[in-house]
Amino acid sequence: MVFGLSRAIRKAEKNAIIAELKVYSPKYGDLLKGRNPFEILRAYERAGAVGISYITDPKYFRGSFEFLRKLCRETELPVLRKDFIASKEEVERTAEAGASAVLLITRLLKEELPEFVDFAKEHGLDTLVEVHSEEELAIALQTDSTMIGINNRDIGKLELDDGNVSLTEKLAPLIPKRYVKVSESGIAGTEDLKRALRHADAALIGTALMKTPDPEEFLRKLVEVEV
């Protein structure tokens, strides 16, 4: 069974960055600003992204499941679907759309998390189990997830908090090596990235990439900077 995203991260020769195609942020509003999302996708590919992330949630992030399908057809990079997944039907739909990985939020799924992880893996999906505290990490470590993501921001506040990589610095050392460790959110530039990648295997970056006038140049700098 091919777990494309976790394998790509483990094999990465440069900094492993999952680049998020983020069209809207509850904090900053419209991030696309009239640009063609597929041109941004190509920029991410050229700059050396290890994978692509996309939020399908329509309510808070103005995403769409149909766009996820198109995205998976348009790129050979592994695609991570982010959403507030709460049903196994949504896991199945993720696999059917052609995504490589699915986000599973510990706070949302609680004791059902191990079952959801196993179900997703049976469907060939990498699982990125998201945590925001030591208590949530304890639950995540009871699963056979391929990846654990530390969300530096609080999803309960819908990214309206600032967030920084100090949570990654605190939690990542507690995660065994069998899991791929991903630092998510709150990474604004190279200094944040260096701090995150001292402890994590990869970083997921969205808002900072979408806000820059030249996503390709900025991402290339992040991929190539010495950490």
UniProtKB/Swiss-Prot annotation:
Keywords noted in UniProt: Amino-acid biosynthesis, Aromatic amino acid biosynthesis, Decarboxylase, Lyase, Tryptophan biosynthesis
Domain of life: Archaea
InterPro entries on file: Aldolase_TIM, Indole-3-glycerol_P_synth, Indole-3-glycerol_P_synth_dom, Indole-3-GlycerolPSynthase_CS, RibuloseP-bd_barrel
GO biological process: L-tryptophan biosynthetic process
EC number(s) stated in the UniProt entry for this protein: 4.1.1.48
Database matches in Pfam families: IGPS
Pathway info: Amino-acid biosynthesis; L-tryptophan biosynthesis; L-tryptophan from chorismate: step 4/5
GO molecular function: indole-3-glycerol-phosphate synthase activity; phosphoribosylanthranilate isomerase activity
Catalysis: reaction(s): 1-(2-carboxyphenylamino)-1-deoxy-D-ribulose 5-phosphate + H(+) = (1S,2R)-1-C-(indol-3-yl)glycerol 3-phosphate + CO2 + H2O
Family: Belongs to the TrpC family.
Entry-linked HAMAP family: IGPS_A
Protein name: Indole-3-glycerol phosphate synthase
Lineage summary: Archaea, Methanobacteriati, Methanobacteriota, Thermococci, Thermococcales
